[in-house]
């Protein structure tokens, strides 16, 4: 186990925990003594659960669709049944499905982007809040994006702008109840290929060009001229989730090599 036990005896929900940043966050919290509820709609979450149990940490996994309020309620009910309370919620579900100019998006595609990248955070905050209010304490970290100012992802950008507004307003509304709410605006992040792609369709030549333009813009706007690593994002997320950030709330922390979004 990690010598730093920032999450000892803490009950932590991590959504979107089956791969990428979510998996990295879950493993770090397990190494630091946390009791975990892993949530994802993919059965890949079971492999992450096995990894965490191999570390000797306490964890359960809930396969559910967090684009629905019922899915968020299911996660909370499992957490309460298993541990009796919730100390930390980390909302990590989201990600751009398509990359193309706004006029190329259909109505249905726009709806899918918003459902994917805004509603899971809204639903999970709403579902967990009564439990945190009951105990007059809690910490929420929303994973946002520096793409709130960027090209070819406007529905996703608007969704993450909504996550930032949710973060600020919820922090303002519930600070008096001992609940802190912050966000990490992740920049471009190097990660293994997704086991379940957000968009499984082959890219057209135009879509390949548009995607490369997004990559180029991301690197150009980073002062450090590179993508970040999963560990670098995990460092920021777990800092805001821990008591080390006890005097920080209502903040959006950009982690994009200097790109402020």
From Swiss-Prot:
It comes from the Bacteria. Its EC number is 1.3.1.25. It catalyses: (1R,6S)-1,6-dihydroxycyclohexa-2,4-diene-1-carboxylate + NAD(+) = catechol + CO2 + NADH. GO terms for biological process: benzoate catabolic process via hydroxylation; fatty acid elongation. The active site is at residue 156. Pathway: Aromatic compound metabolism; benzoate degradation via hydroxylation; catechol from benzoate: step 2/2. Keywords: Aromatic hydrocarbons catabolism, NAD, Oxidoreductase. NAD(+) binds at residues 13-37. InterPro entries: BenD, NAD(P)-bd_dom_sf, Sc_DH/Rdtase_CS, SDR_fam. One of its GO terms (molecular function) is oxidoreductase activity, acting on the CH-OH group of donors, NAD or NADP as acceptor. Substrate binds at residue 145. Belongs to the short-chain dehydrogenases/reductases (SDR) family. Degradation of 2-hydro-1,2-dihydroxy benzoate (DHB) to catechol. Homodimer. This is 1,6-dihydroxycyclohexa-2,4-diene-1-carboxylate dehydrogenase. The gene is benD.
